[in-house]
């Protein structure tokens, strides 16, 4: 999936809506089925461990409130998919994914990356300028793609790019509700000057969210249809909450801020 149109307004390459969030098409799709899950998870861990992520930071690039809002919103969306999902897993915060998102957000590059990680993780991006009341103003555009999505596969949700980008897109939404993508880590960074499709945006607010295991495997549906929690992986031991296979964790985010 190559480049994307806008969100809160009809967007062409030559028209920038600087007070609205823009999203980049999800270019992290794989051409092969997810048959070697264990190998991919092992490789992802190795690549994240070797990623060039600063060990010491003056401040975190996401607040606790923003992190909780993003995580809770994803689980809310995942628990209310239609048709209902039988194997939708509860999403938890992943510190390593957040650190890798932080490293990429700090580059202020309006593109998916770094390239050596994209084979192993999913990634959603959003950017806006101007004031905003909630971090969800950068996240909800991903969910809004649901109106153009026909389960189980994206139909016409392929924007025609790169010279001009138009047409609906769905891959941000499908990554959000990919059943096995049970970990997320995000970062937000304010870029003083950011090149967004040839236009320099001042003080652009850049959100990067990384997902694992990655979703959007071509030819596969994001989840199985059925009675909620009726097809959860055995590792969940039959635990279910809000239509999600629940891992039984006492906290899925606060430990990162200790």
UniProtKB/Swiss-Prot annotation:
Its main location: secreted. It comes from the Eukaryota. Residues 1-21 form the signal peptide. Gene3D superfamilies: CAP (3.40.33.10). CDD domains: CAP_PI15. Induction: Up-regulated by Noggin/NOG and retinoic acid. May be a direct retinoic acid target. InterPro entries: Allrgn_V5/Tpx1_CS, CAP_dom, CAP_sf, CRISP-related, PI15_CAP. GO terms for molecular function: peptidase inhibitor activity. It is found in: Secreted. Residues 71-211 form the SCP domain. Transmembrane segments: none annotated. Glycans are attached at residues 26, 36, 124. SMART domains: SCP (SM00198). Coiled coil: none annotated. Residues 22-60 form a propeptide. Keywords: Developmental protein, Glycoprotein, Protease inhibitor, Secreted, Signal. GO terms for cellular component: extracellular space. Serine protease inhibitor which displays weak inhibitory activity against trypsin. May play a role in facial patterning during embryonic development. Belongs to the CRISP family. Was named SugarCrisp after the breakfast cereal. This is Peptidase inhibitor 15. It comes from Gallus gallus.
């Amino acid at each position: 999936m190559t480049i994307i149109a806008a969100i809160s307004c009809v967007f062409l390459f030559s028209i920038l809506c600087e007070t609205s969030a823009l999203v980049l098409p999800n270019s992290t799709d794989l051409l092969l089925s997810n048959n070697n899950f264990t190998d991919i998870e092992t490789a992802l861990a190795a690549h994240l461990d070797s990623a060039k992520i600063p060990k010491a930071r003056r401040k975190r690039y996401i607040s606790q409130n923003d992190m909780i809002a993003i995580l809770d919103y994803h689980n809310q969306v995942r628990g209310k998919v239609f048709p209902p999902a039988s194997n939708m897993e509860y999403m938890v915060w992943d510190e390593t994914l957040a650190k890798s998102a932080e490293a990429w957000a700090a580059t202020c590059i309006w593109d998916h990356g770094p390239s050596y990680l994209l084979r192993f993780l999913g990634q959603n991006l959003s950017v806006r300028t101007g004031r905003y009341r909630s971090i969800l103003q950068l996240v909800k555009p991903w969910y809004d793609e649901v109106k153009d999505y026909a389960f189980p596969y994206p139909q016409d949700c392929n924007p025609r790019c790169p010279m001009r980008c138009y047409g609906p897109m769905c891959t941000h939404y499908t990554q959000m509700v990919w059943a096995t993508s049970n970990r997320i880590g995000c970062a937000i960074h304010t870029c003083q000057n950011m090149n967004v499709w040839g236009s320099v945006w001042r003080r652009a607010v850049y959100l990067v969210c990384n997902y694992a295991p990655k979703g959007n495997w071509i030819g596969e549906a994001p989840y199985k249809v059925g009675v909620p929690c009726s097809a959860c992986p055995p590792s969940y031991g039959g635990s279910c909450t809000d239509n999600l296979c629940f891992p039984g964790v006492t906290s899925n985010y606060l430990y990162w801020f200790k």
